[in-house]
Amino acid sequence: MNAKIIVCACTAAVISSVVAAVLNQPGVGPGAGARYATDAYPGFDSEDEIVKPSRKEPRLFGWINGPKKDDPASQFAYCEELIGDGDYSKAARHLDALVREWPTSSQAPEAQLKLAEILLDRLQDPDEAFSEYRYLLDFYSLQCDYNATADILYRIAGIMREEGKTILFFRFRNTVDVRRAYESCVLRAPGAVWAADAMLAIAELREEEGKALEAIKVYENLRNIHPGGVQAKTALLREARTRMEVLREYGYNRSRCRDTIDFLELAAAQSDAEAREEIVRLRGQAERMLEKEAFLAAKFYDSRTRTARSAINAYEKFLADFPAGVHAGEVKARLEELKANGGEK
């Protein structure tokens, strides 16, 4: 009985090792060298939204869209002939066909790299080039220069942001696609020298999308991950501005007002003179918004449907919180009037 158990265990171990070896072959699954950020990145796309690595499959109607040759070496040589003749579009199609048909071949990583290079440099299609360079990182991470390829990804993301997306000779702003491109860069190379700049771009693009709360998460996370850089100082000021934009929309929320004021106080203490001046001004605006909301709340009790005593209590609380506020004089005068009338209606 024990011998059977040992044999079964050995068989299972062999099978699992074989499966692992197959899955770890370049081109079959995300490579063992593929590096992803292990920490959470609030403000990025969620796990359900993120673009996950997906292996290329041979196309339908292979006799039309498939490889021209019968083996990867001949197919690669054919692609090089096309490149030499300047037929870059056809070369790109057949390089892609090689990777799809023979993903584990020794020619596949170089074919994938040449495909990405042609799309970027010859066909000038940054969107497709980004996808192909990302595929190179995900499936051939050990067969390529990982850091150099990640740098190219970041550069392409900048091109995509600057040029927009062309559809039928018209250019459109592709804010969401560009943001996701920058997120892909950070997730694949979180320690790159440009990672903080990429996060700044992501937060700014979140603002352009109208997602101020998500932008704040990115700014805050950037400051935590890269606390000593120039980007952290920039993020602090931008976060202050964005928090004020949110506060203007939700000014009736006293808790949010107080949280924003506390944040601005800390931000001012950590900023240089120029940024501090702006943040102090923003804090003054937040304090006036809080006072105005408290004043309107106090006036709510000063009506015919409420007793004078409830109005007096509300006004006294307002003066305790804002003794030197803009509305303090008006509140004191009304308070004296209510008390002069006996404090009851």
What are these regions (language model features)?
Residues 2, 6-8, 18-345:
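Acidic, polar-rich low-complexity tracts and alpha-helical solenoid repeat scaffolds
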Residues 12-16:
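Alpha-helical oligomerization interfaces
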